[in-house]
């Protein structure tokens, strides 16, 4: 399940970048609308990347369960906590992008 940990870290990085680009888009909204649109698109792409990585984490967890391998309770608790943080982060980024 090391790959789940690595995917979780990558998802976090993608979301951090998405937030950074969303904030840059908002900052440039009235200064340079074309640049603002570019930053908004970059943010959306980072969100798409995080979604693709998330789908892979879910797929790997499901595949392990289908083999009869259940993650330890502590690992599941960490994943659940990380997953909740990811959902909150995505919501924050989408809120930023909605201000454009």
Report each predicted region and the residues it spans.
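Non-heme di-metal
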Residues: 1-100
């Amino acid at each position: 399940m090391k790959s789940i940990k690595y995917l979780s870290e990558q998802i976090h990085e993608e979301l951090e970048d998405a937030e950074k680009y969303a904030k840059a888009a908002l900052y440039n909204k009235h200064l340079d609308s074309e640049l603002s649109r570019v930053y908004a698109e970059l943010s959306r792409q980072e969100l798409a990347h995080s979604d693709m990585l998330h789908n892979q984490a879910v797929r790997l967890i499901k595949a392990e369960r289908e083999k009869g391998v259940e993650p330890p309770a502590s690992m599941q608790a960490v994943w659940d906590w990380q997953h909740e943080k990811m959902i909150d982060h995505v919501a924050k980024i989408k809120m930023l992008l909605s201000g454009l």
